[in-house]
Amino acid sequence: MVKQLKFSEDARQAMLRGVDQLANAVKVTIGPKGRNVVLDKEFTAPLITNDGVTIAKEIELEDPYENMGAKLVQEVANKTNEIAGDGTTTATVLAQAMIQEGLKNVTSGANPVGLRQGIDKAVKVAVEALHENSQKVENKNEIAQVGAISAADEEIGRYISEAMEKVGNDGVITIEESNGLNTELEVVEGMQFDRGYQSPYMVTDSDKMVAELERPYILVTDKKISSFQDILPLLEQVVQSNRPILIVADEVEGDALTNIVLNRMRGTFTAVAVKAPGFGDRRKAMLEDLAILTGAQVITDDLGLDLKDASIDMLGTASKVEVTKDNTTVVDGDGDENSIDARVSQLKSQIEETESDFDREKLQERLAKLAGGVAVIKVGAASETELKERKLRIEDALNSTRAAVEEGIVAGGGTALVNVYQKVSEIEAEGDIETGVNIVLKALTAPVRQIAENAGLEGSVIVERLKNAEPGVGFNAATNEWVNMLEAGIVDPTKVTRSALQHAASVAAMFLTTEAVVASIPEKNNDQPNMGGMPGMM
């Protein structure tokens, strides 16, 4: 394919136009008075959302250079979402501010490498100051506050807080669509482990890339399955029952994996293969946990059992299994309650007896998976469009809450970033490095400025007053009042704020040091017009 090139200022300005188009679409959503964005969907109803990363992912621009700029900011949103699960709009606003200010300086003759060093230096100091100002999340109310702020809905914050209370801070919480109007919380026994499907062709929902199995059989073995013939007798019994099967094994490979995928694609049966969790002795113990939870028998040489001789009554069952690329969740296993209780008691005894912190931590994880269960937030709404929007908000709020439990909370509403302004301004630097520090200083005020503008106020006035306010005191855009943000429950997770700043700075620094851009030339439409027929011809 033929390529086209742009250099230096032409390249950067073209990419900046793309950055601005994406960021301008995303930043209207920030703050309590932020607006929604409507996304066109080809085969379904339009999606209405205020989720930054969802909007960013939808944007494709016609001009290849502008599209590259947009993709860079998309990367900021994606990375922040991966690490912290929220804060994507803040990250986008920060990235745009740094790129715009940095480009002004590069155009004026500043050295981009010096600017990058200054940006890195400033971000490092800002992150350290954020951690110093961070407070631990210690009670149910604080967890609810974080969720409520992220979702802009107190009810959602309360549901997440209750879910975390019931299954623990590290427990498994899933979000499902409800058939009714109301949102409900349900806790079901279940187990999750960090192993996903062995082939993407096993998914049942290609949009979400998830395999969902209803009332599946579950084969638990510590063996490697290489030959399809080894499991064929068992699969024939499963096919007759017309139910799906989850295969948890040391490894499913070669002929066995190929035939499972082929039969899945032909619709002969639904089977999902996942690797057994853990390693060594811990793997055996975790397989036993899964077997007890589901009522299965572990097919292992230790018990003299062979896959060829396995029958359907050796399989476990569960009401539902969900398998993603990275995780498997078994919900409501049909194991014997007395056996589960005995296993829980055994694990508790082992936790008390062990002297190793590492072993204790792993045993506690197993106990939580066996006894803690899975909390399910069932999202209700009056229409499908509202349901999707509400579900996205709850997902963000859950991620935000987990991040808060992990690294603590800071003052919300962009206040935390302005609170570290003083520390960053004290950095001693010269020349282009100092200019790089100043780029970050200006960007630190961008989220507050945008929140104020979305509330119909003059952002510069709010920023100047905030710089002179007591630490922790900020502007509540929902009520147009100046309050102590932490006391008012307007908080952001430290991890979210930190990640947004770090990823925005990373992409901005790369953008500023760009000197040439190579893009593909769009293919022209070569369709020829229809030729006129001769008289009497079609």
Curated annotation (Swiss-Prot):
One of its GO terms (molecular function) is ATP-dependent protein folding chaperone. Its main location: cytoplasm. Pfam families: Cpn60_TCP1. It comes from the Bacteria. It catalyses: ATP + H2O + a folded polypeptide = ADP + phosphate + an unfolded polypeptide. GO terms for biological process: protein refolding. Keywords: ATP-binding, Chaperone, Cytoplasm, Isomerase, Nucleotide-binding. One of its GO terms (cellular component) is cytoplasm. Its EC number is 5.6.1.7. ATP binds at residues 29-32, 86-90, 413, 476-478, 492. It is found in: Cytoplasm. It is an enzyme of class 5 (isomerase). The keyword Cytoplasm applies. The keyword Chaperone applies. Forms a cylinder of 14 subunits composed of two heptameric rings stacked back-to-back. Interacts with the co-chaperonin GroES. HAMAP family: CH60 (MF_00600). Belongs to the chaperonin (HSP60) family. PANTHER family: 60 KDA HEAT SHOCK PROTEIN, MITOCHONDRIAL. Together with its co-chaperonin GroES, plays an essential role in assisting protein folding. The GroEL-GroES system forms a nano-cage that allows encapsulation of the non-native substrate proteins and provides a physical environment optimized to promote and accelerate protein folding. This is Chaperonin GroEL. The lineage of its organism: Bacteria, Bacillati, Bacillota, Bacilli, Bacillales.
